[in-house]
């Protein structure tokens, strides 16, 4: 969580199969326009300042490639980020099936199941071409403990909400982490205080015995 602690900089990683519209989602959020055609991404980084729940954040967004041969690079991307947006296309059953692979990779690289992840089904405007229902997406997200939304990079539907909610997930984890650290610190102080009192009682008992002798 080092980035979040640094002036509310939040590092997010966009992951998913090739062709699902990761770049279109990112550019729509950053620049408020829809890109129809673009070269396949290997790695692009974007920054945007935004206000979420009356708090100013600087989002550092890493748009990544979906190709299998870039797995080693993807490990590096994962290590550098705090929150994740996993993208599939509602018009592609295979991209939906790949979500489990990306989720497992994140958990493996970070060695944790407690990672802020938002799963999104892009291209919700193409309902006639839909292969994955909203309920299927919702059920998978619930199974994996992820937040979920359907979006459209073309119409901008839910684009702002996706990034806002992902930042909230990162913040909740950071706040909980700090709360746990504070609790641990208080528990240690309490334990040390008890030990100190016990030692004082032992010493007092020893002194009493010595005086009696």
Swiss-Prot record:
The record's subcellular location field reads: Cell membrane
Name one molecular function that GO assigns to this entry.
GDP binding
Q: Which cysteines are joined by disulfide bonds?
A: none
- Write down the top EC class of this protein: hydrolase
Q: Which GO terms describe its biological process?
A: macropinocytosis; signal transduction
UniProt keyword Lipoprotein present: yes
Q: What is its EC number?
A: 3.6.5.2
Cysteine methyl ester is found on 210
Q: Which positions anchor the lipid (S-geranylgeranyl cysteine)?
A: 210
Recorded hits in InterPro entries, A to Z, give: P-loop_NTPase, Small_GTP-bd, Small_GTPase, Small_GTPase_Ras-type
Q: Which UniProt keywords apply?
A: Cell membrane, GTP-binding, Hydrolase, Lipoprotein, Membrane, Methylation, Nucleotide-binding, Prenylation
How is the protein disposed in the membrane? Lipid-anchor
Q: Which residues bind GTP?
A: 16-23, 63-67, 122-125
Propeptide residues are 211-213
Would I find Nucleotide-binding among this entry's keywords?
yes
Q: Which GO terms describe its cellular component?
A: plasma membrane
The record's section on PROSITE patterns has: RAS (PS51421)
Q: Where is this motif: Effector region?
A: 38-46
Which family is this sequence assigned to?
Answer: Belongs to the small GTPase superfamily. Ras family.
Entries under PANTHER family matching the protein? RAS, DI-RAS, AND RHEB FAMILY MEMBERS OF SMALL GTPASE SUPERFAMILY (PTHR24070)
Instruction: Tell me the function of this protein.
Output: Ras proteins bind GDP/GTP and possess intrinsic GTPase activity.
Q: What is this protein called?
A: Ras-like protein rasX
Q: Which organism is it from?
A: Dictyostelium discoideum
Gene behind this protein:
rasX
